[in-house]
């Protein structure tokens, strides 16, 4: 079993409210480093939840901080891409900025989500920034579950020859039996 470690010190600590502390000043790189030292065969990267509920006024800065930690861990020899939970973005973060920040081997989960700004432009076409990220080697994960996923969005993407690189589930307490 492999795992991505949430950059928030307390992780996702509730069922429906996402109370992660995404203030980069509160990220504990020292603790993250010690966990990578202790579990190098298990930890495969860092996770940042990019949605309105967790970002607040921090905008894209939690992602930048996560990428910086990832670079430090890579310099120490650890495998450490960044995976993001892409969802209902706040107004101060755009899909263009988000997808443009991601690097080769990073992962964008919930690529077919329907909340706020999606991967589609106003005409239903995949945005150029999404294609650009995919061409750079950013992995697109459908991460399907009960929420954060849409069959019509999947069909629209497939009709444009846009396919996920990863097909995974999103099993949480509210979706495991639905």
PLM features per residue range, with description:
Residues 1, 40-44, 76-80, 104-106, ...:
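Short, well-ordered coil/turn segments that N-cap beta-strands
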Residues 29-38, 93-102, 154-160:
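Short amphipathic alpha-helices and their capping/turn segments at secondary-structure boundaries
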Residues 104-107, 112-178:
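Active-site-adjacent C-terminal substructures of enzyme catalytic domains
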Residues 47-127, 144-149:
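Divalent metal-binding pocket/active-site signature
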Residues 1-7, 68-77, 130-137:
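Alpha-helix-loop-beta-strand connector modules within alpha/beta enzyme cores
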Residues 3-5, 84, 142:
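Structural beta-sheet core signal
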Residues 11-15, 54, 116-117, 176-177:
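A short acidic, helix-capping loop that chelates divalent metal ions and anchors anionic groups
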Residues 1-50:
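Divalent-metal coordination cores built from histidine and acidic residues
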């Amino acid at each position: 079993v492999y795992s991505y470690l949430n950059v928030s010190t307390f992780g996702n600590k509730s069922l429906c409210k996402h109370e992660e502390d995404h203030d980069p000043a509160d990220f504990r790189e020292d603790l993250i480093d010690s966990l990578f030292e202790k579990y190098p065969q298990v930890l495969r990267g860092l996770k940042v939840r990019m949605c309105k509920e967790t970002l607040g006024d921090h905008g894209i800065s939690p992602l930048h901080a996560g990428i910086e930690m990832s670079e430090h861990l890579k310099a120490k020899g650890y495998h450490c891409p960044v995976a993001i939970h892409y969802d209902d973005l706040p107004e101060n973060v755009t899909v263009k900025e988000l997808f443009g920040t991601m690097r080769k081997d990073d992962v964008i989960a919930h690529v077919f989500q329907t909340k706020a700004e999606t991967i589609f432009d106003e005409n239903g076409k995949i945005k150029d920034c999404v294609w650009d990220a995919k061409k750079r080697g950013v992995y697109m994960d459908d991460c399907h579950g009960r929420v954060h996923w849409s069959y019509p969005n999947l069909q629209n993407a497939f009709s444009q020859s846009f396919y996920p690189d990863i097909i995974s589930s999103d099993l949480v307490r509210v979706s495991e039996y639905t």
